Each structure stands twice: as C-alpha cells, then as structure tokens.
Amino acid sequence: MTAITALLTASLLVPNLAPAPTAMTAEAVTWTTANSVATGDQDLPSIAMNRNGQVAVVWEDDRDSTAPEDDTHSEIYLRLFRDGTPGYELKLSNGGTSGAAWRHISPDVGLDDKGNAVVVWAADGDGNGVYNIQYRVVSPTGAVLGSGQANASDAGQQIWPKVGVDPDGSPTTAAVAFAVVWEDVQGTAPATVKAAGFTAPTTKGYEVTASQTTGTHHRPDVAVSASGEALVVWDEDADANGSYNIGLTRLARSTGAVVLSRRTANAQSGGQQRRASVAANFAGDFTVGWESDHTGTPGVWARSFTAAGAARHGEVEVSTGTGAIVPSVGIDDQDNAVVGWTVSGVNPDVWARGLNPDGTVDGRLAAQALSQTTTGRQEHFALAASPWGEVSVCYTDDNDGNAFDQVLLGLGTTNSTWLMSADELRRLKARGTPTH
C-alpha cells in the first residue's frame, strides 16, 4: 500500500478523519521516459500543461550513436500526454542540407486549454551557423495547424526562443494565439530582445523590440494570460554598465505596444541577475524566477506580482545550498508559485520548491530533489503548473554515466503538503474547487 493509498483509506475508514499533511516525495511521482526512442542523445527539454490534464514535452533529439556532446543534426520532437497516457509524438523540424552541419536547438513549448501546442526553436537548416526562429502549431490530435518563421528578417542571429500561449484563445476561443520572444543579435551591435504576437496559427499581429534599445539584453522568457497580453522578462543591462537586472514588460495583444512600463523584476540591484523565467495564470497574476549572486553566493530567487504589475513581496531565495542555476517557474490560479532549478556540479541534481502568494513556504511543496534517482547526472530541469496546483517536471537523465541523456517526465506532484489521489483531484476539478 502506498503512502497516498494509506492516507486515503484511513480517511474513509474513520469518520471525520482528514489525511495528515505529508510532504511530496519523488517516490509519489509517476515517472516515464518522454522520448520513445532511446537512440542517441536527448537534451534541453521544455514542458507545458493545461487545466485539462494534458502535458506537452519538447526536446532536442540527436540520433547519432557517438559524440553526445555534439548537437549537429539535432531535431526537435514533441510528445503529448493525456492524464498520464502518451498521445502523439512528432518530429517537427525538417532536417537540413545534405552534407551540412545543420542543427535545430533550444526548443520551447506552450499549451492552451483545448490541447493545442505551440513549439518554437532556433533553426540552422543549411549549416551556415546562422539561426532563425521556427514555430509549429499542433492540434490536440497531433495535426500541424500552422508553421512559419517568427522573425521577419533573416539578418543577424536569432537565438534562445520562448513561447507563451493564450490559455483560452484570442481574439476568440476558437483561435490559437501565442507570443514568441527571442534574443536578436545584429552584427557587432549589442543584443536586444524581440517579440512577435500571433492571433492565429499563421496570422502575425506584430513584431517589436520588447527590451530597451540601449545597452545589451539577453535570454528572454514570455508568459501569456487569458487577456492575450505577453509578459516578457529578460537579462537587462540597459545602461551598459555590465551589471544585469531582470527586465520586465507587458505587450498588448494585437499591436505589441508596451502596456506595462519597462522595469526591473528584482529590487536588489547588487551583483548579477540572470536567466529569468516567468509564468502567468489565467487572470494575469505572475511569478518571476532568476539567478542572483547579490548576497555573494549564487542562488535562485523569485518574486510574485499581481496582474497590474505590483509586487506581492520582495524577492525571496528559493534554493538551498550552493550551485543553484537555471530556474523554471509555474503558477496556479490561486497564485501559488513553484520554482525548479538545477544544482550544478560533477553530478548535477534537480530541485523544486513551492511558494505562497506572499513568498512564504508553509503548506507548499517542500524544497527537495525531484528526480527519479539522484545517481549520476540530472540537469536541464523544467517544470509547469496547472491552474489546479498540479506540477509536472522534466529533465535530462544520465544515471548510467554513458554521457547519453534521456528526457525523464514526472507527473503527479502537487504544490501542497497534502497528498491526494488522481481520482480525488478529478473530483475537485469537477466541482471547481482549488487544491490549495
């Protein structure tokens, strides 16, 4: 009998006895390998989930049987799971020029509440070392509804794309609407952050510079709420002094006009703030995570905001110990946040922790290693939260030490110290009751 079953059985046998709060553990999570083919090396996964039990995972897939450190001829794969059951699996990229060192790398995925997935990645199909941002819109059954290039101009380098998807469609619920952001490098000019908004799979509403045009700007992320507006964060050095903050703005649905003035998500300005991650819920409340070393010790920090852009609390350190890097964040419809990160080192580990809307941790997912095993190397951690407080995670795993990674998917975590069965969660969803 599992811990979950025992708790639920006790509550049924003894009247008015509620299950005692129990910290979630990795053993309570259902683990599966996201990629169905183990050949080669799978890297840099990303994950999204919606309110209806669907989870989408994307990754780089290099089927070469040698040199796992070399991402030449990597393709982009997408797999959808419905209530934990595998659905479709698709190769979305189109290879490249024969004999060339082509690559498709750094994918990201978003998912609306109907189950439509949007995937973006950096593509170099001719192997000339110059990347553009490709996207695909995929239906709940795995049909490609639209494809294209997010950036209008091929000039320069377009790298590190991210995508946010309107959960209920915009401008109508029948549409698939999304925003794409990326880092744009033109020759020797400092990098900027670009954003493009789409109101349908092939209907582009705008392309704008999301960051300031002065200074240098890197590695954006984006989240889209039901309003259709795009929240954008990035590594910002607008004054070109070499010190980075976390830039933050919001762009209008149809025009890309700035509707939340450009500002910094972090209040502490000492040291370096980098690798921003953002997530928004249906109402537009959002949370931001990033790396910071302003205390003298690098760690992962987070801060939550209202839909109007007002901070709910000062930034809080989420990680414990040293070596925490590359945060990933999620938020539910009760404004509870969850933050994941990788602990760097010879044998990296992946961790997660939950936060209340005010930045406290009582009652939320306890800080812990959240992987199937801690043997060997686990890294490239990504997570997503549903409106109900469910948490899905993925990461790359090399527990056998052969240097070839697989993508592990973990389902069944909740951002709460109260464990519940899948049946109980479905009943709560049917009643419209938050899991808080």
Per-segment meaning from a language model:
Residues 414-436:
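C-terminal cell-surface addressing/anchoring modules of secreted/extracellular proteins
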Residues 4-7, 27, 52, 423:
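Absolute N-terminal positional cue centered near the fourth residue
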Residues 21-417, 436:
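Extracellular, repeat-based ectodomains that mediate carbohydrate processing or recognition
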Residues 1-23:
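Secretory targeting and sorting signals
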Residues 12-13, 17-18, 256, 360, ...:
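Intrinsic disorder/low-complexity segments in short proteins, especially the signal peptide
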